[in-house]
């Protein structure tokens, strides 16, 4: 439910950004504001609490961000406060980034490996993913020793699991079925 709501808000502000040719700028502003909220938990809690009126919260947003963000983003934050949706700002920013990538025909991918990938391996994986998806894929390497070996690629809702850990788990399951 929260993802659906966040998608609606992200889509709405993204459309405005596209119309004004400010979609990149809007993303940067939203990302910074969301980070500010995460870094300053007391302030973020204050924006979510019913103790302050919506008008007081909007005045706070106006005073803090009027010189740091575009009028459209400040007004967007005020709408989130009016609709009691400021708490999903992180989800909105994440979905906005996906919309921005789709608009630029880009996909973000995470390659999870047991050890850091070499530059050559990363380039080869990027090339293969670009070929597979017919999109411009940006791959980031994340190290997780629990995968043991191989690679787990996450792109949006899709996962390509070529890890040793998963192969061992499948083998274990097959052996249990044979023995049982």
UniProtKB/Swiss-Prot annotation:
Subunit structure: F-type ATPases have 2 components, F(1) - the catalytic core - and F(0) - the membrane proton channel. F(1) has five subunits: alpha(3), beta(3), gamma(1), delta(1), epsilon(1). F(0) has three main subunits: a(1), b(2) and c(10-14). The alpha and beta chains form an alternating ring which encloses part of the gamma chain. F(1) is attached to F(0) by a central stalk formed by the gamma and epsilon chains, while a peripheral stalk is formed by the delta and b chains.
Mode of membrane association: Peripheral membrane protein
Compartment annotation: Cell membrane
GO BP terms in the entry: sodium ion transport
UniProt xrefs under Pfam families: OSCP (PF00213)
One GO cellular component term noted in the UniProt record for this chain: proton-transporting ATP synthase complex
Keywords for the protein's UniProt record, in alphabetical order: ATP synthesis, Cell membrane, CF(1), Hydrogen ion transport, Ion transport, Membrane, Sodium, Sodium transport, Transport
Role: F(1)F(0) ATP synthase produces ATP from ADP in the presence of a proton or sodium gradient. F-type ATPases consist of two structural domains, F(1) containing the extramembraneous catalytic core and F(0) containing the membrane proton channel, linked together by a central stalk and a peripheral stalk. During catalysis, ATP synthesis in the catalytic domain of F(1) is coupled via a rotary mechanism of the central stalk subunits to proton translocation. This protein is part of the stalk that links CF(0) to CF(1). It either transmits conformational changes from CF(0) to CF(1) or is implicated in proton conduction.
Further remark: The ATPase of C.paradoxum is of special interest because it uses sodium ions instead of protons as the physiological coupling ion.
Molecular function per GO: proton-transporting ATP synthase activity, rotational mechanism
Similarity comment: family membership: Belongs to the ATPase delta chain family.
Name the UniProt record assigns to this protein: ATP synthase subunit delta, sodium ion specific
NCBIfam families the record matches: ATP_synt_delta, PRK05758.2-4
